[in-house]
Curated annotation (Swiss-Prot):
Organism: Escherichia coli (strain SMS-3-5 / SECEC)
Name listed for the protein in its UniProt record: Phosphoenolpyruvate carboxykinase (ATP)
Alphabetical UniProt keywords: Acetylation, ATP-binding, Cytoplasm, Decarboxylase, Gluconeogenesis, Lyase, Manganese, Metal-binding, Nucleotide-binding
Listed GO biological process terms: gluconeogenesis
Amino acids binding Mn(2+): K213, H232, D269
Length: 540
């Protein structure tokens, strides 16, 4: 067994963890496999072996992130820079926490981890050595260590020898905070950050995504302050080195559409864009598996094998997986190391500057076209609007599609004001001569979801330039430029009005959606730059 590799219990004592029985340091996949399937494990610690070779775990009631339980310590480091939930017009999840309450939460987590056998995983967040975070994850649960090993960048032995953590994540999933009411918190569960101590604490929730998205929120704080774009997007690169980025909220198609046999994958969810180009923050993928089929998404299906980790899927007695069963959650997931996808950028997940920027939206109203080409002002408007329908299950309590606006297609993970991300992105796009497009992967007037086949043909037309050469017409009210025809796409669906029994039906729904856009964008009109963008949005 690879135990501690030079990491001593004394080092953990510096974080407040005492009486450590032993440290399993950067465990191998083989060791994690044995640990997860240990028959003596009970509850959510226990893994189940599936017939695809991957282990499956359950995360209990926490089958998605808990944004209402997210807190950031408000102190001299963050007071004037963070985008706070209790200031300004914008709504977000960055609730302030006092240094005193932080110390109490830290005491709960360190008490939980003390006197235990611990898994410690050292990993990088960010493929660019100049700006990456060296993160140390500490947990008592084997599969949580496995999740981290899948999702973050795995250091070489040489890099581990000189590893000095910039950030510590202590996962105390088994502990809760009984004093939450007196402290004015949302519940007994917590996901808390301290930028001065450079630490994240997790209590009460078993959901693996809290570690992944926690570090994304930190990159979203640190990078834009250096002029580097930090983006909730997937990215891939073509044979000629042409890079495309796909922005979108969970479930809109980021992973599916960027995993393309004709292009090499840079990453599926979190990226930076600096003077050298686009780079991945992660070393793995976290794909939704609800209704997954080998026929529709072969690359993702084939990635589910030994070393992949499934979450909240239904495993039958014979070890087979029912991917259609959403009874635990619609947000069933699999994490796997990025090299489980054959067609990836090697050896480092980065490439040149992006020339195509694609905003993915899933419109539950059936109003927006499957694709439109955006002007420079429309690019900023739709980036700041971040419209989609929240799809079932990516957060607790949401089971039906409901319209939502999420600034920069990732408001839940923003640490600075949205306009700061828009400014950095626009500068990067202008320097690279990039063009933006709005792609609707949602529903049309028939009530049917636009097919993956049609959406893939649309993406192909964007990437090969044929969309830029196509004739366009303007969709009224939203003033969006829509191609009259595209190769491989049913022409009838390009104009959303054609999918309704009458144009009046579209008009009625369009007015409802336009009003939602206008009302949402009002929060940006308190600055001259924001007010100037109103004209790029829908008009009633």
């Amino acid at each position: 067994m690879r135990v501690n590799n030079g990491l001593t219990p004394q080092e953990l004592e510096a974080y407040g963890i005492s009486d450590v029985h032993d440290i399993v340091y950067n465990p191998s996949y083989d060791l994690l496999y044995q640990e997860e399937l240990d028959p003596s494990l009970t509850g959510y610690e226990r893994g189940v072996l599936t017939n695809l070779g991957a282990v499956a775990v359950d995360t209990g009631i926490f089958t998605g992130r808990s944004p209402k339980d997210k807190y950031i310590v408000r102190d001299d480091t963050t007071r004037d820079t963070f985008w706070w939930a209790d200031k300004g017009k914008g709504k977000n999840d960055n609730k302030p926490l006092s240094p005193e309450t932080w110390q109490h939460l830290k005491g709960l987590v360190t008490k939980q981890l003390s006197g235990k056998r611990l898994f410690v995983v050292d990993a990088f967040c960010g493929a660019n050595p100049d700006t990456r975070l060296s993160v140390r994850f500490i947990t008592e649960v084997a599969w949580q260590a496995h999740f981290v090993k899948n999702m973050f960048i795995r250091p070489s032995d040489e890099e581990l020898a000189g590893f000095k953590p910039d950030f510590i994540v202590m996962n105390g999933a088994k502990c809760t905070n009984p004093q939450w009411k007196e402290q004015g918190l949302n519940s007994e569960n917590f996901v808390a950050f301290n930028l001065t101590e450079r630490m994240q604490l997790i209590g009460g929730t078993w959901y693996g995504g809290e570690m992944k998205k926690g570090m994304f929120s930190m990159m979203n704080y640190l990078l834009p302050l250096k002029g580097i774009a930090s983006m909730h997007c997937s990215a891939n690169v073509g044979e000629k080195g042409d890079v495309a980025v796909f922005f979108g909220l969970s479930g809109t198609g980021k992973t599916t559409l960027s995993t393309d046999p004709k292009r090499r994958l840079i990453g599926d969810d979190e990226h930076g864009w600096d003077d050298d180009g686009v780079f991945n923050f992660e070393g793995g993928c976290y794909a939704k598996t609800i209704k997954l089929s080998k026929e529709a998404e072969p690359e993702i299906y084939n990635a589910i094998r030994r070393d992949a980790l499934l979450e909240n899927v239904t495993v039958r007695e014979d070890g087979s997986i029912d991917f259609d069963d959403g009874s635990k959650t619609e947000n069933t997931r699999v994490s796997y190391p990025i090299y489980h996808i054959e067609n990836i950028v090697k050896p480092v997940s980065k490439a040149g500057h992006a020339t195509k920027v694609i905003f993915l939206t899933a419109d539950a109203f059936g109003v927006l076209p499957p694709v439109s080409r955006l002007t420079a002002d429309q690019t900023q408007y739709h980036f700041l609007s971040g419209f989609t329908a929240k799809l079932a299950g990516t957060e607790r309590g949401i089971t039906e599609p409901t319209p939502t606006f999420s600034a920069c297609f990732g408001a839940a993970f923003l640490s600075l004001h949205p306009t700061q991300y828009a400014e950095v992105l626009v500068k990067r796009m202008q320097a690279a001569g990039a063009q933006a497009y709005l792609v609707n992967t949602g529903w049309n007037g028939t009530g049917k979801r636009i097919s993956i086949k049609d959406t893939r043909a649309i993406i192909d037309a964007i990437l090969n330039g044929s969309l830029d050469n196509a004739e366009t017409f303007t969709l009224p009210m939203f003033n969006l430029a829509i191609p009259t025809e595209l190769p491989g796409v049913d022409t009838k669906i390009l104009d959303p009005r054609n999918t309704y029994a009458s144009p009046e039906q579209w008009q009625e729904k369009a007015e409802t959606l336009a009003k939602l856009f206008i009302d949402n964008f009002d929060k940006y009109t308190d600055t001259p730059a924001g007010a100037a963008l109103v004209a790029a949005g829908p008009k009633l």
